[in-house]
Curated annotation (Swiss-Prot):
Function as written in the Swiss-Prot or TrEMBL entry: Catalyzes the reversible conversion of 2-phosphoglycerate (2-PG) into phosphoenolpyruvate (PEP). It is essential for the degradation of carbohydrates via glycolysis.
Entry GO terms, CC: cell surface; extracellular region; phosphopyruvate hydratase complex
Underlying gene: eno
Name listed for the protein in its UniProt record: Enolase
Binding residue positions for Mg(2+): 241, 283, 309
Subcellular localization: Cytoplasm; Secreted; Cell surface
Upper lineage: Bacteria, Pseudomonadati, Pseudomonadota, Alphaproteobacteria, Candidatus Pelagibacterales
Pathway stated in the Swiss-Prot or TrEMBL entry: Carbohydrate degradation; glycolysis; pyruvate from D-glyceraldehyde 3-phosphate: step 4/5
Keyword Cytoplasm among record annotations: yes
Entry's transmembrane regions: none
One Pfam family it belongs to: Enolase_N
SMART domains reported in the protein's UniProt record: Enolase_C, Enolase_N
PROSITE patterns cross-referenced by the UniProt entry: ENOLASE (PS00164)
Biological source species: Pelagibacter ubique (strain HTCC1062)
Cofactor(s) listed: Mg(2+)
Length: 418
């Protein structure tokens, strides 16, 4: 039996230049490390991200206190534990914290250790990480939901909707999916330049031109798809992350303009852009507690992927409530929303049993860590959301998926999205 002999944490930086935590777990001869990501638009019910809140240290954003918790409290509790018993490791971490949202130790401390332990277990077994999750054979590659225009909390350009994405629906393999996205992105860049707009990028690598109107952004995306020789809604589909929590006041929303309107009016406007632009996926169309609005949208849309992110926060209890209310048909999976690998796998497993599509996701403050690429393949998740073909912390995940596809060889195939 391989046991945990040592755990060491350190403060490093995420892709937004903010401090985050890296944990390294050691066995007798090997070690593995993992870096915890961080979100910008976060749900109220997410597991707690613990920071020092000392303005003299990184303007209150340092995690040195959290690092110390790993190096003392967590390390002491886990030393001697079987590295291959992920459930036990995570249960010890959960019980040691003792709170619903992991406020004592911080989900960032817990997750970094949980991920590092999972990596080390695979390393000791000398198997690829993706082979250590839920699937034991017949691995599927996810379709990329590639962010090509950033708005909302991810860019300072006035766009209401946070993410405009493309999905290469007709790609026969992951390599082809990447090629299709590459072509559309490069044609989009040319169109943006032609309009005299900036091609600077947002937090997740998508372009962030100064466009204040959602439909103008959508027109640009459609033009880029057409210019690339593809059919919108058939070869390539447009997908949105609205992040409606950021656009809500009481029971009204300002999604499509600065004017706040009712849920019913918002649904009418959604239906309009769905039909006009052949939108195939909408994430967080309404607020995290507006269950009725979500259910109404589900009743008023057909063949559209309605994705719960802030609604579910990778939490099994909230997912079960959403299922009973018919609130969505898909769930976004973010490891740091719940805080351990085991709990994340539990949510994915349940979501797939009830017929939901599972979409593995990065965070806007991410790193070179590629754990989620392996997680997507190892759970046969339908899609992965990990930014654009810009910024190395985003591209790192795509490169890992290409490596996995190459390793699988003729056994590699794409997941189902319809």
């Amino acid at each position: 039996m391989s046991k945990i002999l040592k755990i060491k944490a350190r403060q490093v930086f995420d892709s937004r230049g903010n401090p985050t935590i890296e944990a390294e777990v050691y066995s007798k001869k090997l070690s593995a490390s993992a870096i915890c990501p961080s979100g910008a638009s976060t749900g109220t019910y997410e597991a707690f991200e613990k920071r020092d809140d000392n303005n003299k240290k990184y303007l209150g954003k340092s995690v040195l206190g959290t690092v110390n918790l790993v190096n003392t409290k967590i390390s002491k509790k886990l030393i001697g534990t079987n590295i291959h018993d992920q459930t036990r490791i995570d249960t010890i971490l959960i019980n040691l914290d003792g709170t619903r949202q992991k406020t004592n130790l911080g989900a960032n401390a817990i997750l970094a250790v949980s991920m590092a332990a999972k990596k080390l277990s695979a390393k000791i077994k000398n198997v690829p990480l993706y082979k250590t999750f839920l699937v034991k054979n017949n691995y599927k590659l996810p379709y990329p939901l590639m962010n090509i225009i950033n708005g909302g909390a991810h860019a300072n350009n006035g766009l209401r909707i946070q993410e405009f994405m493309i999905r290469p629906d007709k790609a026969k393999n992951f390599s082809e999916a990447m090629r299709i996205c590459f072509v559309v992105i490069n044609n989009l860049k040319k169109l943006i330049i032609k309009k005299g707009l900036s091609t600077s990028v947002g937090d997740e690598g998508g372009f962030a031109p100064m466009i204040s109107n959602n439909e103008k952004a959508l027109d640009l995306v459609v033009a880029a798809i057409n210019k690339s020789g593809f059919k919108n809604g058939k070869d390539v589909s447009i997908c949105l992350d609205v992040a409606a929590n950021e656009l809500m006041k009481k029971d009204k929303y300002s999604i499509h303009s600065k004017k706040f309107v009712s849920v019913d009016q918002s649904i009418k406007e959604y239906k309009k852009i769905i039909n006009k632009y052949k939108i195939k996926s909408i994430e967080d169309p309404f607020g995290e507690n507006d269950w009725m609005a979500w259910s109404k949208l589900m009743k008023n849309t057909n063949n559209v992927q309605i994705v719960g992110d802030d609604l579910y926060v990778t939490n099994l209890e909230r997912l079960k409530k959403g299922f009973l209310n018919n609130s969505s048909n898909s769930i976004l999976i973010k490891l740091n929303q719940i805080g351990t690998v085991s709990e994340t796998l539990e949510v994915i497993k349940f979501a797939q049993i009830i017929g939901y599509k599972t979409i593995i996701s990065h965070r806007s403050g991410d790193s070179e860590d590629t754990f989620i690429a392996d997680l997507a393949v190892g759970t046969n998740s339908n899609q992965i959301k990990t930014g654009s073909l810009a910024r190395s912390e985003r591209v790192a995940k795509y490169n890992q998926l290409l490596r996995i596809e190459e390793e699988l060889g003729k056994k590699a195939s794409m997941s189902k999205i319809h």
